[in-house]
Regions:
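Short glycine-biased active-site loop of nucleotidyltransferases that positions the nucleotide triphosphate
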Residues: 74, 205-209, 253-260, 377-378, ...
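Carbohydrate-interacting/catalytic domains
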Residues: 1-152, 176-186, 454-457, 468-476, ...
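Conserved alpha/beta catalytic core and glycan-binding cleft of carbohydrate-active enzymes
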Residues: 308-310, 325-491, 498, 519-575, ...
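Short, flexible loop/turn elements at secondary-structure junctions
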Residues: 51-53, 77, 88, 160-165, ...
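N-terminal cationic-hydrophobic initiation segments that often serve targeting/anchoring roles
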Residues: 186, 232, 304, 353-357, ...
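Intrinsically disordered, polybasic Lys/Arg-rich low-complexity tracts
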Residues: 636-753
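Substrate-binding/active-site clefts of carbohydrate-active enzymes
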Residues: 118, 138-153, 160-341, 605
Length: 753
C-alpha cells in the first residue's frame, strides 16, 4: 500500500484532494469553494482553494472590511490546497481570495469554484447554498433516461437569454420570468430543445458569455442560481430540453479570474507557445494537468447534475485539437511525435466524454468542431473523441454560400447542395444555423438571400424545407424563424414588431408547420446517421437546380422531398418513384398560407409504368418556382410469407385430392372430359379474337407518351439522373430488361395519331 493510500484510509477527508491531484475528482465543487457549515455549534463558511505557488492566502470580504491577512488560510495538504473556516459568514456575503505571490505581490482573486457572483462591473464571489431547490421534473428525467438520444427528434432553438425579449428597453427578464415568456412560444413553434449561449459568469457583455470567469456560477445578470434552476425545471415540465454552451477551450485574462491565479500559471499552459490564443486575447487551459482536468470535468458534471441540464455544446473544439490553430510558423511547436495535434487536449476530451456519458448516457455532448478531424462522435475506446453529436460546419458553409448565390448562377454551384452526402453519415451531425452566422457584418439569414423582398422569403422557405429534410439534427438561432432583417445585437431584443407584417408572420407559420411535420414524421429523424434512412432520386439536375430524395423511417415509411432552387415553374417534371400508387403532396413551401404564390398544388399524383432513376415506375409533377415539396410515399403492399411446413402439407393434400378426383372422373364419366377440351379451345380463341380489350389498353398508354413529349425539355435532367448510378445501380439494369411494353406503347401512340 502506498503512503498516500494509507493516509487516506486513516483520514478519508484527504480523499477529495488525492482524487483532485489524480485528475479524477469529478465533483471537486463539493470540496473546493465556499460551503455553509456548522462547526462546534457555530455556523459559518469553510473556504478552500487550490493555489500551488502562493506564499500566503487570506479570505477578504465585507465581513472583515476587505483587510488582507485578517483571516489567513492554512495549507491542508502541506502543498497546494488552502482552507479556512470563518464563523458568522452567511449566504450572499461577498468575498475574494487575497493571494501573496512568491514575489511578494498581493493579488485579489474571485473563487474559481464560486456558485454565485456579483453582477458586472463588480466581480466578487458570493457565498451561496445551492441545495434545497424543489424540483418538479421527475417525469421528464425518467422519460429522458429511456429515450434514444441519437435516433430521436432534436430540433434546437438557439438563443441568448439577455436579448431574446426584454422586460423594458434595457432590463432583461430573470431566468424564471424568461421561462414563463419562452415556454408558450417554444411549444407553439414546436422546438424540442432550447440551447442557451453561455450563462456561466462572464465580465464582458460583448463576449456573449464565451470568456468565462465563473465555471460554477450562472451569470447573475439574470438572477440567482435557484432562478436558473427554476428556468430549467419549468422548461422540463413543459416538455422542452435545455442545452447550454460550455467553454473549456480558453478563458480571459481578467485580473480577478483564473489567469496567473497565484501569480504564476495554474490553469493555463505555462508554455507561451501553447498557453495563449493571441487572436482572441485569451489563455488556453493546461489540459495535461490533473488538477485542471478535475476542475473542468467537475464543471461539466455540475451543470448536468445540479441544474439538470440535458446537454453541453462544447465550444471551439478545433482550437483545442491543433497546436497550430490560428498560429503562424514559429508561434507553435510540435508535439512529442512531431505532429500538430494537441495530444493532451485529445486525451482530455476523451476522458471528459467517457466520464459524462458513462454516468449519463442519455445526455448530449455536442462538439463545435470545424475541421475534418476524424471520429469526433465515435467512442474513445474505438479511437474517437467520444462526443455523441457534432456540428456540421461544412454543410452550413456550403449551403449558405449556395443560397447567397443568384439563382442564375446556381447551376455551377450545384455540388454545394450535394457534397455533404459524401460525409453525411461519417458523424452524428447537427445542422447549425447559429448565432455565428448572423453577426460581424455577415447579415441576418433572410438578408443573405438574393433578390427583392418577395424573393428573399421564397429562397428562405426553400432552404428551410431542404434543411428540415436533410439528415441530421436541427439548430436555428432566434429571430431567423420569422425573418429578422437586422444582425443580432446582444444589447437589443429581437424585432418582434416585424410580426405585424404578413410576410414575417407567414414565414413564422411556415417554420412552425415544418417543425410540426418534422416531429410527427420519424422519417426525418429516426435514421439520421445511415444510408438506410436516405436515398437519392435526382442528385445531379444542376441545369434546373433541382434535387429530389427520399427519407425513410425504421418501419419503411417514406417521404419524397423535391427542391427547386430556381424561380422557374417546372411543369411535367418526371422523377422515379420507389413504390407504385398515389403520391400525396403534404407540404408545399409556395403555399399561400406561407407567403407563397399558391399557384401550384400537385395534390394526388399517380405513378405510371415508365422506369426512371432506377425505379420501375415514375411520377410527373409540377414544381412551383423556388420551392420545396414533400410527398407522402404510398406504403408497399407485401404478401404474408407462407409457412413452408404448412405449404408442403397443403401441396401433398391437394395432390392427393386431385389424384383421387381424376381417378373417379375417369372411371365414372369420360364424356365429360371430352366436352371440356372444346371449351378450353373456344376460350383461347375468344381471347385471341377479342380485339377490343387490347385496343382500350393501348389507348390509355397512348396518352402517357403525349404528356411526356410535351415535357421533353423537363425530362432532360431525368436522363442525367441516370448518370450517378451508384445509388440505383441494381435497379437500373432491371428497368432496362423490360423493353417489351415500350414498343407496344409506341405502336399504340402511332395508332392513335
Amino acid at each position: 500500500m502506498r503512503p498516500t493510500e494509507e493516509k487516506i484510509q486513516k483520514d478519508p477527508s484527504d480523499l477529495p484532494i488525492y482524487l483532485f491531484k489524480q485528475g479524477n475528482n469529478c465533483e471537486a465543487y463539493r470540496y473546493f469553494g465556499a460551503h455553509l457549515e456548522t462547526r462546534a455549534g457555530e455556523s459559518g463558511v469553510v473556504f478552500r482553494v487550490w493555489a500551488p505557488h502562493a506564499a500566503a492566502i487570506s479570505v477578504v470580504g465585507d465581513f472583515n472590511s476587505w483587510k488582507p491577512g485578517s483571516h489567513p488560510m492554512r495549507k491542508v495538504d502541506g502543498d497546494s490546497v488552502w482552507e479556512l473556516f470563518i464563523p458568522g459568514v452567511k449566504e450572499y456575503d461577498v468575498y475574494k481570495y487575497c493571494v501573496t505571490t512568491r514575489g511578494g505581490d498581493l493579488i485579489y482573486k474571485a473563487d474559481p469554484y464560486a456558485f454565485h457572483a456579483e453582477t458586472r462591473p463588480s466581480n466578487g464571489s458570493k457565498v451561496y447554498d445551492i441545495t434545497g431547490f424543489a424540483w418538479h421534473d421527475d417525469a421528464w428525467q425518467t422519460a429522458q433516461k429511456k429515450a434514444d438520444v441519437i435516433n430521436g427528434p432534436m430540433n434546437i432553438y438557439e438563443m441568448h437569454a439577455g436579448s431574446w425579449k426584454l422586460k423594458d428597453e434595457k432590463v432583461p427578464y430573470n431566468y424564471s420570468e424568461l421561462a414563463d415568456e419562452l415556454i408558450p412560444y417554444i411549444r407553439e413553434m414546436g422546438y424540442t430543445h432550447v440551447e442557451l449561449l453561455p450563462v456561466m459568469e462572464y465580465p464582458f457583455d460583448g463576449s456573449w458569455g464565451y470568456q468565462v470567469t465563473g465555471y460554477f456560477a450562472p451569470t447573475s445578470r439574470y438572477g440567482t442560481p435557484k432562478d436558473f434552476m427554476a428556468f430549467v425545471d419549468k422548461m422540463h415540465e413543459a416538455g422542452i430540453g435545455v442545452i447550454m454552451d460550455w467553454v473549456p477551450a480558453h478563458f480571459p485574462k481578467d485580473g480577478f479570474g483564473l489567469y496567473n491565479f497565484d501569480g504564476e500559471a495554474c490553469y493555463e499552459d505555462p508554455n507561451p507557445k501553447r498557453g495563449e490564443h493571441k487572436e482572441w486575447g485569451t489563455m488556453v487551459f493546461d489540459f495535461g494537468r490533473s488538477e485542471v482536468q478535475s476542475f473542468l470535468i467537475s464543471s461539466a458534471l455540475y451543470w448536468l447534475e445540479q441544474y439538470h441540464i440535458d446537454g453541453l455544446r462544447v465550444d471551439a473544439v478545433a482550437s483545442m485539437l491543433y497546436l497550430d490553430y490560428n498560429r503562424k510558423q514559429g508561434e507553435w511547436e510540435p508535439n512529442k511525435n512531431g505532429g500538430k495535434e494537441n495530444l493532451e487536449a485529445v486525451a482530455f476530451l476523451r476522458k471528459l466524454n467517457d466520464t459524462v456519458l458513462g454516468r449519463h448516457p442519455h445526455k448530449c455532448m455536442i462538439a463545435e468542431e470545424s475541421t475534418a478531424w476524424p471520429m469526433v462522435t465515435k467512442p474513445a475506446s474505438d479511437g474517437g473523441l467520444g462526443f455523441n453529436f457534432k456540428w456540421n460546419m461544412g454543410w452550413m458553409n456550403d449551403m449558405l454560400s449556395y443560397m447567397k448565390t443568384d439563382p442564375l448562377f446556381r447551376a455551377g454551384n450545384h455540388n454545394k447542395v450535394t457534397f455533404s452526402f459524401f460525409y453525411a453519415f461519417s458523424e452524428n451531425f447537427v445542422l447549425p444555423i447559429s448565432h455565428d452566422e448572423v453577426v460581424h457584418g455577415k447579415g441576418s439569414l433572410i438578408n443573405k438571400m438574393p433578390g427583392e423582398y418577395e424573393a428573399k422569403f421564397a429562397n428562405l422557405r426553400t432552404f428551410f424545407g431542404y434543411m428540415m429534410a436533410h439528415p441530421g439534427k436541427k439548430l436555428l438561432f432566434m429571430g431567423q424563424e420569422f425573418g429578422q432583417f437586422t444582425e443580432w445585437n446582444e444589447e437589443k431584443q429581437l424585432d418582434w414588431m416585424l410580426l405585424d407584417y404578413d410576410k414575417h408572420t407567414e414565414l413564422q407559420n411556415y417554420v412552425k408547420t415544418l417543425n410540426a411535420f418534422y416531429k410527427e414524421h420519424p422519417a426525418f429523424w429516426q435514421i439520421d446517421y445511415s444510408w438506410e434512412g436516405f436515398q437519392w432520386i435526382v442528385p445531379d439536375d444542376s441545369k434546373q437546380s433541382v434535387v429530389a430524395f427520399l427519407r425513410k423511417d425504421a418501419n419503411g415509411k417514406q417521404i419524397l422531398v423535391v427542391c427547386n432552387f430556381n424561380p422557374v415553374l417546372r411543369e411535367g417534371y418526371a422523377l422515379g418513384a420507389p413504390v407504385a400508387g398515389t403520391y400525396k403532396e403534404v407540404l408545399n413551401s409556395d403555399d399561400e398560407a406561407f407567403g407563397g404564390s399558391g399557384a401550384v398544388h400537385n395534390k394526388s399524383v399517380r405513378t405510371h409504368k415508365k422506369p426512371l432513376h432506377g425505379f420501375e415506375q415514375s411520377i410527373t409533377i409540377t414544381l412551383p418556382p423556388m420551392s420545396t415539396l414533400y410527398f407522402e410515399v404510398p406504403t408497399k403492399r407485401t404478401r404474408k410469407a407462407a409457412d413452408p411446413a404448412k405449404t408442403a402439407q397443403t401441396v401433398k393434400k391437394t395432390a392427393a385430392k386431385k389424384t383421387a378426383a381424376k381417378t373417379t372422373k375417369t372411371a365414372k364419366a369420360e364424356p365429360v372430359v371430352k366436352e371440356e377440351k372444346p371449351k378450353k379451345t373456344s376460350t383461347r380463341k375468344a381471347k385471341a379474337e377479342a380485339e377490343p380489350a387490347p385496343e382500350k389498353a393501348p389507348a390509355k398508354r397512348g396518352r402517357k407518351p403525349k404528356a411526356e413529349a410535351a415535357a421533353a425539355p423537363e425530362a432532360a435532367p431525368a436522363k442525367r439522373g441516370r448518370k450517378p448510378k451508384a445509388e440505383p445501380a441494381e435497379a437500373a439494369p432491371a428497368a432496362a430488361e423490360k423493353p417489351a411494353r415500350k414498343p407496344r406503347a409506341k405502336k399504340a401512340a402511332k395508332t392513335e395519331e
